Amino acid sequence: MPRYLGPRFKKIRRLGALPGLTNKSPKAGSDLRKQPRSRKKSQYRIRLEEKQKLCFHYGLREYQLLNYVRIAAKAKGPTGQVLLQLLEMRLDNILFRLGMASTIPAARQLVNHRHILVNGRIVDRPSYRCKPRDIIMTKDNQKSRTLIQNSLGSSPQKELPNHLTLHPFQYKGLVNQIIDSKWVGLKINELLVVEYYSRQTKA
């Protein structure tokens, strides 16, 4: 599955809120009269849609998510929780959760265009796995700071997860610890995603 570049509203109508993809949300009952009454979803369809939520929210291709599932399966702890921790600790997601980018695609652009430093060094990989005590900040130039300032000014005020600290006037964020599962930024049943891939490998 390639990275999704199509209409975002269409996806959130089908899958629900995907804050990493877009900060818009469908109005309650929107387009209900236009949609035919759907049949009861199969278990496969339910698992597939949970997997798609992760891909669209975090901006992952199919093979990338599969790699994360494999890494999580080999780690200590419940596979689903470890999977979400791995995704939440990506640099592009950390920038998004800090409010330094309005969406994960916007955060990815900041990283790809070399506007972001981690511990004083430019990091241009959105998938960089952040660690406790990492310091994330913008380059010391007007263009980079303006991009972050615009995002901080336009992003809706949300409670910052407890594994992060933001210093907005310094254009800097700190990673305090590995994220706790209750602070994950997406409503998701991660066990269904793990089940989806385990059943795919057995098929």
UniProtKB/Swiss-Prot annotation:
Q: What is the name of this protein?
A: Small ribosomal subunit protein uS4c
Which terms are listed as keywords in the entry? Chloroplast, Plastid, Ribonucleoprotein, Ribosomal protein, RNA-binding, rRNA-binding
Which branch of life, at top level? Eukaryota
Return the InterPro entries for the record. Ribosomal_uS4 (IPR022801), Ribosomal_uS4_bac-type (IPR005709), Ribosomal_uS4_CS (IPR018079), Ribosomal_uS4_N (IPR001912), S4_RNA-bd (IPR002942), S4_RNA-bd_sf (IPR036986)
Q: List the disulfide bonds.
A: none
Cite the S4 RNA-binding domain residue spans from the record. Answer: 89-152
Query: Which segments carry the region annotation Disordered?
Result: 19-43
What are the GO MF terms of this UniProt record?
A: rRNA binding; structural constituent of ribosome
Subunit arrangement?
A: Part of the 30S ribosomal subunit. Contacts protein S5. The interaction surface between S4 and S5 is involved in control of translational fidelity.
State the similarity comment. Answer: Belongs to the universal ribosomal protein uS4 family.
Q: Name one GO biological process term.
A: translation
Point out the coiled-coil segments of this chain. none
Subcellular localization(s) per the UniProt record: Plastid, Chloroplast
Q: Pfam families, alphabetically?
A: Ribosomal_S4 (PF00163), S4 (PF01479)
The record ties this protein, via SMART domains, to: Ribosomal_S4, S4
Instruction: Give the protein's biological function.
Output: One of the primary rRNA binding proteins, it binds directly to 16S rRNA where it nucleates assembly of the body of the 30S subunit.
Q: Which gene encodes it?
A: rps4
HAMAP family (alphabetical): Ribosomal_uS4_B
GO cellular component terms, alphabetically, are: chloroplast; small ribosomal subunit
Q: Known SUPFAM superfamilies for this protein? A: Alpha-L RNA-binding motif
